[in-house]
Amino acid sequence: MSSNPSSVEKKLLHYTGKAIADFNMIQRGDRVMVCLSGGKDSFTLLTILNQLRIKSGNKFEIFAFTLDQAQPGWNDACLRQWLAEKSIPHEILTRDTYSIVKEKIPEGKTYCSLCSRLRRGIIYRYAEENGFNKIALGHHRDDLIRTLMMSILYNGDIRSMPPKLLSDNKKHIVIRPLCYVQEKDIITFASEQAFPIIPCNLCGSQENLMRKKVASLIDQLAIENPKVPSNMLHALQSLKPSQLMDQNFWNFKNLEDGLETAQSIQCEEVFNAQEFEIEDEKI
């Protein structure tokens, strides 16, 4: 920890430490690979995790991994210098995913899905080859609630970014230690620390992304009620299956079995769901 930490730094240490404890993200002896993209979120994650590592008495390891995706204008000279000054073990790996994305995705369409899929495969492979059992990502509270809103509005399902996840290849645990942290605090901290931010020109050139629209919507609602963002985060931790409609999690069809009646009631379906199927149409 800094000799004289600012109020926002104390706040970040508190909420990151709380998330790690709440979800048992890091255990003694873990080798944690922190994905450092060069953005404010990942710089903050690496800095705070490094301070918590020192505070713990080095009970776990951290390693910074940066993927150079060969985007035009990429310059990691300042990033390399910063990592060297902090004495954080690291590697910057170059893989040209940029050309693949540009080739596969039509102009004007969102690159995020393919780009993240390619990046994820490289990250998992690197972690496996180098013996890292935990992969830390820099998603924060606002990322989680925006993803929730996007899933509901555009995909028709209720999902977000879990704080802790078993990787697709079942060989790693992915953690998001900043899941309680507000983006505005990260912005303040990044400014205080003067991180050598590397902009993502690939994403920044697409102004019409759904995520920006959803972020704007949540911000507008928060003007009227500042508790909206925290309420949305709380909703992710307070699921009530009986108040929803997913029959995989609640046995709506046979609720009659729980009735307290003097005599048992024989339940027989009047309608069959197949009678009401409408092909290729969503209610």
UniProtKB/Swiss-Prot annotation:
Compartments reported by the entry: Cytoplasm
Where does this protein act, in terms of pathway?
tRNA modification
Cellular component GO terms, alphabetical? cytoplasm
Please tell me what else the database record remarks about this protein: The thiolation reaction likely consists of two steps: a first activation step by ATP to form an adenylated intermediate of the target base of tRNA, and a second nucleophilic substitution step of the sulfur (S) atom supplied by the hydrosulfide attached to the Fe-S cluster.
Q: Which residues form the signal peptide?
A: none
- Which GO-annotated molecular functions does the record name? 4 iron, 4 sulfur cluster binding; ATP binding; magnesium ion binding; sulfurtransferase activity; tRNA binding
**UniProt name for this protein:** tRNA-cytidine(32) 2-sulfurtransferase
Q: Identify which cofactors the protein needs according to its UniProt entry.
A: Mg(2+); [4Fe-4S] cluster
Q: Where does [4Fe-4S] cluster bind?
A: C112, C115, C203
Q: How is the cofactor bound?
A: Binds 1 [4Fe-4S] cluster per subunit. The cluster is chelated by three Cys residues, the fourth Fe has a free coordination site that may bind a sulfur atom transferred from the persulfide of IscS.
Give the EC number(s) under which this enzyme is classified. 2.8.1.-
Task: Give the enzyme class.
Answer: transferase
